[in-house]
């Protein structure tokens, strides 16, 4: 059951652009030189979040596996699944010109039965260039079983570029930096 939840979360993340669809699933196997050429270029001025050493591993009973190209980032109090290259690419653009991203957050002890709309607050600031702050929607709890609930939150970014995103829930705060590109 734990694997089922992990798979569903990953499929949802892929559908919203949080995680890349593996190149081998798109068009056969890709050689390493071709893969390097396809990797997005992040400007040195954007300090994207890199995989930590040692890697963060979610506490049991939460899933600890990821797909290639992704990593768990955070602490037992609040964590998220990010891309290892620090980018969000190909986000849908809404009629108002903003770029939509759906985020999935985990908090040890979060109980969906007690809080359907958890008070997760997500803020964001563009680094290096002025832009209005991101818009954050209402957070929702979600799960496919009683042991692994997580929190979803949709954000709208008013511009492409380098963004510092911060989530706050209960007594936890987690920030990361991403390069948002077309």
Question: Which residues make up each language-model segment?
Answer:
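Positively charged n-region of N-terminal signal peptides that target proteins for export
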Residues: 1-4
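Bacterial N-terminal signal peptides
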Residues: 7-18
């Amino acid at each position: 059951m734990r694997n089922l939840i992990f798979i569903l979360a990953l499929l949802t993340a892929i559908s919203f652009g949080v995680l890349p669809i593996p190149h081998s699933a798109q068009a056969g196997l890709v050689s390493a030189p071709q893969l390097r050429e396809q990797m997005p270029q992040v400007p040195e001025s954007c300090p994207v979040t890199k995989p930590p050493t040692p890697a963060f591993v979610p506490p049991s009973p939460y899933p600890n596996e990821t797909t290639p190209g992704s990593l768990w980032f955070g602490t037992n109090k609040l964590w998220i699944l990010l891309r290892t290259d620090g980018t969000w690419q190909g986000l849908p653009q809404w009629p108002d010109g903003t770029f939509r991203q759906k985020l999935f957050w985990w908090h040890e002890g979060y109980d969906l039965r007690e809080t359907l709309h958890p008070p997760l607050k997500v803020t964001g600031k563009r680094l290096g260039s002025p832009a209005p702050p991101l818009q954050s929607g209402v957070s929702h709890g979600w799960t496919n079983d009683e042991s692994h609930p997580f929190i979803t939150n949709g954000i709208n970014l008013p511009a492409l570029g380098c963004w510092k995103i911060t989530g706050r829930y209960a007594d936890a705060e987690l920030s990361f930096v991403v390069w948002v590109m077309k």
